Amino acid sequence: MRISSLTPWAAGLAAASLLLLPSSATAGQRSASGSPAPAGASAGVSPAGVSSDAAVDAYYAAAEGKTGAALKTALHTIIKSQSKVTYDGVWNALKVTDQDPANSNNVILVYSGRSQSKSTNGGGVNDWNREHVWAKSHGDFGTATGPGTDLHHLRPEDVTVNSTRGNKDFDKGGSPVSEASGSFTDSDSFEPRNAVKGDVARMLLYMAVRYDGGDGFADLEMNDKVNNGSAPAMGRLSVLKQWNLQDPPDAFEQRRNQVIYDTYQHNRNPFIDHPEWVDSIW
């Protein structure tokens, strides 16, 4: 089930990556700024590494050979089996999942790319707080244990930048965001920096598969719109699919997925392990 270098998805990924990344960058070894990370940097963060191909294949065995709605349903069944974290527990979890590979005292802020002390979490200016990448008002789940505390879409972010992003959908364009170099925003959308465009896409797509309305929360769905308001939907899907190709999973994102699986929720984001499944479903 591993991705072949000859698949159409991989060919598209390679072409898209050339448009986005400097020639010196390598997928899987990018620092917060998007430049190449030192060799072995991710391995120094934690004993938790990336699962073997065999272990990942076994986890997704029930999805093998499926496409479209059948694949989405199979993945939902697999990933809905999980442990849940409380909203207070998210603070300490993010200090592990988003630890800076180069400084174990810091976390990397998702949109800013800034390395910041773990101890500066809170609600004050220049503190970092808990960003819901799938805006919690889109489906009105708030901070309830479940979608409101799911680590697969919660990331550390500067308080001011988090406020600027608000509950906007994701799309291209806008004005530069202060304290988040490479990010842009306008009245109805937010564009993250290049180094996490794919991360954002895969987090949102995970949420749309994991939460289907069957566990007391809204059925979260993707669409090709912005201005979704309080509807249980996020967009713009066509742009997010491009970002999934342009910014493939790197070592930081893969390690994060593994730590969530090993230590906290015991479920995985399938689109980090198999980014080609995005086009298979959508």
Locate predicted features.
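Bacterial N-terminal signal peptides that target proteins for export
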Residues: 1-11
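General helical structural elements
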Residues: 6, 34, 259-260
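N-terminal module-boundary/linker segments of secreted carbohydrate-active enzymes
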Residues: 12, 19-113, 277-282
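Compositionally biased, intrinsically disordered low-complexity regions
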Residues: 14, 29-30, 36, 42, ...
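Domain-level detector of nuclease and nuclease-like folds
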Residues: 123-282
